[in-house]
Amino acid sequence: MPLARHLAGELGITWTDLWNVGRGELEPESKASGNQHAGILPPVENVHQPGDGWVDCACGRKHWGTNGASGILLARRDPVSGKVTHVVMQHRAAWSAEGGTWGIPGGATADGESPIEGALRESYEEANITPEDIEVVGSYREDHGPWAYTTVFAFEKPGHTVEPKANDDESMEICWVPIDDVPNRKLLTAMKTDWPRFAARLDELACAGHR
């Protein structure tokens, strides 16, 4: 599976940026009409893994991931105060759905994986986030019925250093972003909606872990 993911990256294929796109966006027959960067198209070739595929959602949209999808919201804490100082964010490829916006690393959940396992795998393959360097502390599941997206909350472990980087063409950049700067970024629509809730939850989890 990591090999397939690597090959997909070399081809510039994406699946993490497809989980929240509207009906027809980036589908072969409607790339030009569904993508604001219509002149920047992904390669025709594609590499699939079990779990890749479109789901017709009850919300009236199509989402990527037959088993749902998930991503890691990784935070760094001040070693003295315990407060959250940074989070890892993904600057999405220009040709992708909502290209040029910022979100979190993640993607479709493979057959046999839990959402957390899928998020850990995707974040390692896509963003160089090694599971050994982080601590999973919670999750939030947005459930649409036939499809769901799970945001996994995690902290960089004390004494460990995560050095995120873009491992494939799905991202222009993956980096640590100061927590106060997140709202100033051009966020993915779903992230813009959820960010106030996510930021508050990270603060709660950080305080609980620092007691």
PLM features per residue range, with description:
Residues 163-201:
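NUDIX/MutT-family hydrolases
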